Structure formats: C-alpha cells, structure tokens
UniProtKB/Swiss-Prot annotation:
Keywords assigned: Cytoplasm, mRNA processing, Nonsense-mediated mRNA decay, RNA-binding
Domain of life: Eukaryota
Cell location: Cytoplasm
Protein name (record): Enhancer of mRNA-decapping protein 1
Family as reported in the entry's similarity comment: Belongs to the EDC family.
Compositionally biased spans, kind Basic residues: 63-74
Biased composition (Polar residues): 83-92, 248-264
Amino acid sequence: MLAQQQPPTPTPTPQQSQPQPQPQPQPQQMSQSRKSKSKKKQSYYDEEVRTLPSGAPVDFGHGKKSTSKPKSKSKPASSSTTNFKLTASPSLPSGAKPNFQPYKSTSPSPPPPPPPSTQPSTSTSTSPTPRTSTGNKNHHNRHQSNHSDYDNDHPQLSLPNGKKPNFFNNNNNDKKFSTIPFDSSINLIRKQYNNPNTKAIKEKKLDNNNNNNSSNNSNNSNNSNSAYYAGSSFHSSPDALNLPKPSFKSNNGSPRQSSGLRDY
C-alpha cells in the first residue's frame, strides 16, 4: 500500500507568533520581593563601621548611634581639655602658682555663719559669739602680714644717717609728718599743699648787684620791682627785656628784588 501523504504543516503567521500574556504574580512572590528590598536597605545602613588607623571608630557627628562598644567612664581626658587647663592655670618654673594680687590673702575664706534657728529665742539680748571676734582677729593678722610682705619686697628709702626722708620739709618731729601717710585724708593733703615750704618751685630772688652793668636806669628800676621770679626759661625772665632791640631801616624799606624778565 502506498504511504499516506501527511498534510504540510502550516507556517506560523505574525499574529500567531506574538507572546502570550504572563500570568499575574501571586501574593507570596510580591511579599518576597519586598523582603529582598528591605534586606538591601538594611545591608546599606548596617555596613561595616569605618575606623581610623588607630582602630577608633569614625564619628562624623550626624547623630547616628555607633555600633561599637560603649565608652568607659574611666577614660582619661582628651588633650584639648588638658591644654585648656594648662593655659588657664599658669605656673612658675618652680611649680608654684603666681600671686598677681599680693594684698589678697591666699588662705581659704572662713566658713559662712550658720543660718538662724527657726525656734523663737527666749532671751531678748544676745551676747556676741566668739566666732566673730576670731574672724576679726584673723582678718587683722592677714592685713598686717600682707603689709609686711609688701615692705619686704619694697624697702623704704632712708638717708645715709639712717633717718627717713622728709619730703614735705616740715619742722615737726612727729611721725605723722616724717613720711607720706598711708591713709591720709583730703584735709591733710590740702594743708601740706598750701604750705609754702612744700611747693616744688620756690621763688628765686634775683640779685640786683648783677644788673649794675645795664645801660638804662629804667631797666634797673624794672629789675628792682621784679625781685622775685619763678620761671624756668631765660626768655620769660625780666632780664630778657634788657637785651638790645634790633633796629630796622624805615626809610629805604626792604631791598627790591630783581626779576629775571626785563621791561622793554
């Protein structure tokens, strides 16, 4: 028997070659994709902490909590704080702190008095407590010690015979006028200023015998009238009036200067 001829296979048309629409993903696949995205974000934020060459974590100051171990409280202070302390508290080469105010006592201040009791006092008159008296004594002693330290550092001036100099030129032998008083009042200063012996510039009496060589008798009379002179310059003294005055020619006048141009 003759073999049966198979019909030719039809060629696919362009309409038949189009891909079929894919089925919609199931809800489980959607949840898996979301989980993968969240894992990527977590891996981005949970990356390894960047460290310095010394091993310390890098802190950029963005407020993000570092995953490193918490810092111990017993960690030594940073170098910046130590430098600030060194500059704020200078010291001498010997190690002692300088005292820029010698009059102020370096001893600790006395403790404040206790607050008054709330209970009513039975006695109307209260006797002074011994603490106040001791406090006044301590303050007085510190004041004297400060003055003694100042006197040791700044010795007082003395004359070759051992006496203290008298800058006010007073004949009084009291100790008040021997040296400048420490706590002098305004009235005392005024008295010393008004005293003619205390003035720095004294009136100098001119000798009339030195003016006998003057040419005019009128000048001699002027010198006798101005017997006292307190100036410090010769040009302001009465003797400057005795100098010969220059004479100027009033007839001819000033010489006429010749100009370079000629009048034609």
